[in-house]
Swiss-Prot record:
Fe cation binds at residues 46, 129, 133. The gene is egtB. One of its GO terms (biological process) is ergothioneine biosynthesis from histidine via gamma-glutamyl-hercynylcysteine sulfoxide. Monomer. The lineage of its organism: Bacteria, Bacillati, Actinomycetota, Actinomycetes, Mycobacteriales. Belongs to the EgtB family. This is Hercynine oxygenase. It comes from Mycolicibacterium smegmatis (strain ATCC 700084 / mc(2)155).
Amino acid sequence: MIARETLADELALARERTLRLVEFDDAELHRQYNPLMSPLVWDLAHIGQQEELWLLRDGNPDRPGMLAPEVDRLYDAFEHSRASRVNLPLLPPSDARAYCATVRAKALDTLDTLPEDDPGFRFALVISHENQHDETMLQALNLREGPPLLDTGIPLPAGRPGVAGTSVLVPGGPFVLGVDALTEPHSLDNERPAHVVDIPSFRIGRVPVTNAEWREFIDDGGYDQPRWWSPRGWAHRQEAGLVAPQFWNPDGTRTRFGHIEEIPGDEPVQHVTFFEAEAYAAWAGARLPTEIEWEKACAWDPVAGARRRFPWGSAQPSAALANLGGDARRPAPVGAYPAGASAYGAEQMLGDVWEWTSSPLRPWPGFTPMIYERYSTPFFEGTTSGDYRVLRGGSWAVAPGILRPSFRNWDHPIRRQIFSGVRLAWDV
């Protein structure tokens, strides 16, 4: 079982991270940097509202809470689109901070009474939710125009020459896809249940595609040749006027959290849509991996005939193994984490950039919704809002405590404000 002290520590780390992202004046927190994102003050109060809902109101939105019902509903993400939230009568930042602090104090009292045999899933859900919103707030801050509010990030390890453009073989055969509550008690519903699948051999990129490799695609006219693009992708490329990854400037620089800088050739490319990733792969004579292929390359140990908890083994993520936590503000150069390689030799599979896969979001066989029933189910393929592609592996902005090889993210194929990149795959 997960110790109460561990849950308390993870709650504290998430809150510390959140508060660092809202250390700005009230006017700044109420700004909407882009219609795709919420004002930061909405995210802040929403974090507290969801914590209260799941830990103090038993997940029942009709159960009275600390906020008046009409205020509580302002923070329902399904009721109010991101574009509309700037026009809502939101709590002032001081009230939002006070609300979050009060909820947290009561939540910790509840944690103290948690039975010893309770794995604390509701607390883990709240921790994951807050950390995911911290990444969302970083996306918003990256879209902000004007003088920088954040620094350029902590130093990162150097990369290794010769790894870009290389691949590793993943032999075919059965493996265990997904996890169960016994092995990963804090896994989310779409990661479960564990089940055996058998897939053919394939090759997968040792590291993600780099900025330098993407520059070759641009220089070769990749954005101007419809033969590399799917019909939907080409239509979007034309409609949106895509000519390079988001935040790349015509003079060869990029804008990152308001800082103008040269584009490092050895960093994984980020801020590309699924359609761009798909086109690049076609141009490179490759394809995108399926999410099942991706998970096997990341987590399966063919010698042990079992899953690894992380690509490198059982050790918890650290600065020597992966770029996580958000303090770097960017991906690490490829080859920076040889100790973090998977059993097959694939590197940087956790952290740095979310990697587009070719897979739509589907439930695993035997899927059962968790207590937060709307977490996954409304987004599955075939639902009214089910136009999504799965991304795997996390990014530099993801908290290390919530990331697993089985973690499944998803977004619309046109989105690229997210910290998204590409890893290639090939048939064998």
